[in-house]
Amino acid sequence: KEGYLVNHSTGCKYECFKLGDNDYCLRECKQQYGKGAGGYCYAFGCWCTHLYEQAVVWPLPKKTCN
């Protein structure tokens, strides 16, 4: 599974500005989803890869980013 890293309190994606390989996104994806996860910056949001199937990613149901 893969998807955008989401802030559970706001419903917003984690923003990033350095597209492609991005240490911030990689670190945040690993912190939230475990050391097996990967991450990079895609369309100005942190995109996480190699997630477990139950991982929660953006968008959150009933929670819009504002």
Swiss-Prot record:
Pfam families given in the database record: Toxin_3 (PF00537)
A Gene Ontology BP annotation from the UniProt entry: defense response
Xref: InterPro entries: LCN-type_CS_alpha_beta_dom, Scorpion_toxin-like, Scorpion_toxin-like_sf, Scorpion_toxinL, Scorpion_toxinL/defensin
UniProt keyword annotation of Iron-sulfur present: no
Tissue/organ expression: Expressed by the venom gland.
GO cellular component: extracellular region
Top-level lineage group: Eukaryota
Keywords attached to this entry: Disulfide bond, Ion channel impairing toxin, Neurotoxin, Secreted, Toxin, Voltage-gated sodium channel impairing toxin
Residue pairs linked by disulfide bridges in the UniProt entry: 12-65, 16-41, 25-46, 29-48
Location in the cell: Secreted
Domain named LCN-type CS-alpha/beta: residues: 1-66
GO molecular function, one term: sodium channel inhibitor activity
SUPFAM superfamilies listed in its UniProt record: Scorpion toxin-like
Lyase in keyword set: no
Comment on protein domains: Has the structural arrangement of an alpha-helix connected to antiparallel beta-sheets by disulfide bonds (CS-alpha/beta).
Similarity comment text for this entry: Belongs to the long (4 C-C) scorpion toxin superfamily. Sodium channel inhibitor family. Beta subfamily.
Role of this protein: Beta toxins bind voltage-independently at site-4 of sodium channels (Nav) and shift the voltage of activation toward more negative potentials thereby affecting sodium channel activation and promoting spontaneous and repetitive firing. This toxin acts on human Nav1.6/SCN8A voltage-gated sodium channels. In vivo, is lethal to mice 40 minutes after intraperitoneal injection at a dose of 5ug. No activity is observed when injected into crickets or woodlice.
The protein's name in its UniProt record: Beta-mammal toxin Co1
Species name: Centruroides ornatus (Scorpion)
Organism placement in taxonomy: Eukaryota, Metazoa, Ecdysozoa, Arthropoda, Chelicerata
